[in-house]
Each structure stands twice: as structure tokens, then as C-alpha cells.
Amino acid sequence: MNTLGCFLRLTTFGESHGDMIGGVLDGMPSGIKIDYALLENEMKRRQGGRNVFITPRKEDDKVEITSGVFEDFSTGTPIGFLIHNQRARSKDYDNIKNLFRPSHADFTYFHKYGIRDFRGGGRSSARESAIRVAAGAFAKMLLREIGIVCESGIIEIGGIEAKNYDFNHALKSEIFALDKEQEEAQKTAIQNAIKNHDSIGGVALIRARSVKRNQKLPIGLGQGLYAKLDAKIAEAMMGLNGVKAVEIGKGVESSLLKGSEYNDLMDQKGFLSNRSGGVLGGMSNGEEIIVRVHFKPTPSIFQPQQTIDINNHECECLLKGRHDPCIAIRGSVVCESLLSLVLADMVLLNLTSKIEYLKTIYNEN
């Protein structure tokens, strides 16, 4: 499937080395002011070629809006948008056109569809994630209207873990590091991987909070059973290239605790802790939503590796091209966009949860 969302639905199309990639975002309400500066900034955050820690491939990533916007406001109809691919180098893949790159999707895509699109991974390339970032920018415009903001950064690279989380620092950091004190060690780990023609894994932290620090998030976003908020968040994150695990709140650590250690106690002002990561029973509880996303090392490394070709013959694979040494870095921006899309979707879906909401809409005139 190529569509994400229940009410606010994003459908994407295109390949890494095709003429363009694009998306259709259906379900956006009318009357939302389109913030072109925000859209451009989001695309630049994900953009390659900015420093030595990410891919050298630098696309312009100019978003061309083709529908759903009139005089700088959303019209309520599907928002269509395109991003042209201008700096693809398909010749870098000529030597592996009949090979399966280890730990890439080449093998599974070929056996499922019978087509070997070797040009940068085709549809399975992380290039497609640029569309998710563009769509996430539109979702952020919606969330801003009701006081919700999403933020992200890197908390771990190669086992070097952040001790403190500073989202303002992450915005200025070359690797979106949340901890200034650990940043240099994390950078060194990436540089060592590059020197060894290797790659390295990492963990991104994404959170949603109220724009106003003294206010809570809306309570009740998400459904109790088959559209749980945490399930939809995990689904969106796991649909991103290279993601191998998603944690909400304490996540895996929860399985090591007793109930007396894990439970979030309450007083008249609210919760006294947030080990649940802002989600209870599949719905937001008003606290910050905390998500950790674990990325595997980039499978594209510049070392000789054993593999097979499309005829099942054993051979050696030696890659060329331009690749991220740590996909978690730019991946953190995509995860932030995905959380924005999921929350915007749940906000719109929540309008049907009480008859009072519908009466407010339809009886106001």
C-alpha cells in the first residue's frame, strides 16, 4: 500500500531516480494558512549535502503545490504536490544492476514484483521520505492552529547515548544531537565508520507537546481498539526505511519494571510522571507524547560483501554512489513529520467521538 492515515490520508508515488516524486494529502480542512517558509525549512532540514555526516546527494527539494491551495489557503480538497529529482546518478548503480545488495530491499522487491529497478533502490529508496516531510509540514500547519508542536533529535549513535535532551540545540546541530556534551563523541563515531567504509546505527527521539509550556495536550486522541494512537505511531514509524524498533514512553524498559515502579501516579493537577509516554489505552492522556525510533546501520557500505545475483549465483558486491553513513540523522526529521501526520489525523478523527462536537459544528448557525 502507498497510503498512510485514516481521515487525513497521504498517498505517495515516485522512485529515487525517476523524474519526480509526489504526494496527495486528502482530508485537510479548508482555511488553513499555508506557511511556505515552514514548508521550505522542513525540506532543508531533511536535505542532503549539508555536511560530512550525511549523504552528499543534495536535491533542491522545491515543493510544487499542484492542487488544494487557493490564494495561500487550503481549500479542503486534496493537496497535490511534486518534488523533481534533479541530481540522480543512475550510472553509479550499473555494476550492481543484477545483484542483490545485502540488507537492502532489492531481494524482496524482485521476488514480489519480478522487476529489478536498480536505480538507487527505486520505490524502496529513502528518497521517497521527502514526500512525507512535505506532507508533515502541512500537518504541522494544522496542529499549530490547536496548539500542538512536534520536535525531534538524536539521542544515540553507535551506543553513545544522550544524557540530556535539548531540542533547541538539536535544531542547530549538524547531526541534530540532543545532548551537546555527547555530540562530539557521536560525530567521532560517525567519522570512524566513514573512514572504515562502514555505517552506523542510531536512535531518534520525537516528542509532541503543547505550544504553551504550562498547558497539556488534548486528551483522547486515538481510538480504544483498532486505531490506537500508539499503534498508529508505530505503524507510521515502522513504515520508514531502516527503522527496526519503536518505543513509546519507557518502551522496552517497561518489561523490566514492577507495576509499583512503572505506574504514573496522579494528583489533582495531573500525572506525577510520564512513563507511559503520553498514551493510555490507545489514547493521548494529555502528557507529552514521547517516541523513540531505532534505525539500523545504513546497508549501503563501501566494503566488498558476499551476495547473489538474480540468477542465484554467488558473487561479490562493491557499492558506489552517495549514501548516508547514519540514516538516523535525517531519519529523525522524517519521524517528526510522521508524528505530525498521525496526530493531525487523530485530531480530525476525534471530531466524531462525541455528539456534542457535531452539535457544536452543525448548530452554530
From Swiss-Prot:
EC annotation from Swiss-Prot or TrEMBL: 4.2.3.5
Cofactor: FMNH2
GO CC annotation, single: cytosol
This protein's pathway: Metabolic intermediate biosynthesis; chorismate biosynthesis; chorismate from D-erythrose 4-phosphate and phosphoenolpyruvate: step 7/7
InterPro entries: Chorismate_synth, Chorismate_synth_AroC_sf, Chorismate_synthase_CS
GO biological process entries: amino acid biosynthetic process; aromatic amino acid family biosynthetic process; chorismate biosynthetic process
Pfam family, one: Chorismate_synt
GO molecular function terms listed in the Swiss-Prot or TrEMBL record: chorismate synthase activity; FMN binding
Binding site for NADP(+): R46
Keyword Signal applies: no
Keywords, in A-Z order: Amino-acid biosynthesis, Aromatic amino acid biosynthesis, FAD, Flavoprotein, FMN, Lyase, NADP
Annotated positions binding FMN: R123, S124, S125, N241, G242, G281, K296, P297, T298, P299, S300, R322
Gene3D superfamilies the UniProt entry points to: Chorismate synthase AroC
Function statement: This reaction introduces a second double bond into the aromatic ring system.
HAMAP family (UniProt xref): Chorismate_synth (MF_00300)
Protein name: Chorismate synthase
Organism name: Helicobacter pylori (strain HPAG1)
Gene name per UniProt: aroC
